[in-house]
């Protein structure tokens, strides 16, 4: 099989073996990283071993990052331990980013610990990519992420909270409710958002408390109001109504509360009438 490779604006057809030779023997870093890129796109598992060799031994960071990307595309778990090593030890930030992304594709319980460790990487892009990789892996990462909610570093707690909301495992709800008390506002913002995504009614009282707390950050309170709208629990109706009625002017918080109030009313109107537990008529608002 031959594949077309762009070389100095010329299209050159190269076979699989020619690409392997370029990868392993060319003195040009550009030729080597182009070979790695194309080998990943070709999807031939015979390229895995040469790409692992390059990932471990090539002195050029661009070549190593394309090797990491290619190994993720090929999806062979033989590359997992080598990608973990690159994630932990490679000095090149872009290589660590690509290794994290590749590990997210490969998945499996073995990659969870190194990815969670990378939430504490000195480079923010590595942290973000590791978080996205853990989200891609899904539920198998939940327990390790829950433990990370107690990490001393605020960015780790933020990333773990975000990831747990995206993964959607309700076993994280109790711990994220505790994160509503975190000293850092960014963690609390992620916590209210994630509780909305997790969609567990047990979070309703805690979210109401946050929304009603006038000493809390406005973004956190608005996030709590938005989450209540997602949960659509009738218990939030009166607190939302009181917040709006007591406001001197309608800002972002009150606007969000109003939207959530309407969502909950719409979702529960028939049940409320059947139970005859409310005297609120179905109006435009009140």
Where are these regions (language model features)?
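Amphipathic alpha-helical scaffolding segments comprising HEAT/armadillo-like alpha-solenoid repeats
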Residues: 9-23, 44-56, 76-88, 108-120, ...
């Amino acid at each position: 099989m031959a594949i077309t490779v762009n070389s100095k604006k010329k299209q050159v057809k190269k076979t699989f073996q020619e690409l392997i030779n370029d990868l392993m023997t060319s003195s040009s870093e550009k030729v080597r990283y182009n070979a790695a890129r194309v080998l990943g796109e070709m999807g031939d598992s015979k390229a895995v071993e040469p790409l692992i060799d390059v990932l471990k031994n090539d002195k050029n960071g661009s070549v190593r990052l394309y090797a990491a990307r290619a190994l993720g595309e090929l999806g062979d778990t033989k590359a997992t331990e080598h990608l973990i090593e690159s994630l932990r030890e490679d000095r090149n930030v872009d290589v660590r980013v690509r290794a994290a992304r590749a590990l997210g594709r490969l998945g499996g319980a073995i990659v969870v610990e190194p990815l969670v460790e990378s939430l504490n990487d000195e480079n923010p892009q590595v942290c973000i990519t590791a978080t996205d990789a853990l989200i891609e892996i899904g539920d198998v990462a939940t327990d390790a992420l829950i433990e990370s909610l107690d990490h001393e570093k605020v960015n780790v707690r933020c990333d773990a909270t975000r990831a747990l909301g995206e993964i959607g495992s309700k076993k994280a709800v109790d711990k994220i409710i505790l994160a509503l008390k975190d000293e850092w506002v960014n963690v609390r913002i992620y916590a209210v958002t994630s509780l909305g995504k997790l969609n567990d009614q047990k979070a309703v009282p805690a979210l109401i408390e946050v929304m009603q707390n006038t000493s809390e950050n406005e973004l956190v309170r608005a996030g709590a109001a938005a989450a209540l709208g997602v949960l659509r629990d009738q218990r939030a109706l009166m607190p939302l109504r009181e917040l709006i009625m007591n406001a001197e002017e309608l800002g972002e918080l009150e606007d969000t509360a109003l939207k959530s109030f309407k969502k909950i009313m719409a979702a529960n109107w028939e049940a409320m009438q059947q139970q005859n537990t409310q005297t609120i008529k179905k109006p435009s608002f009140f």
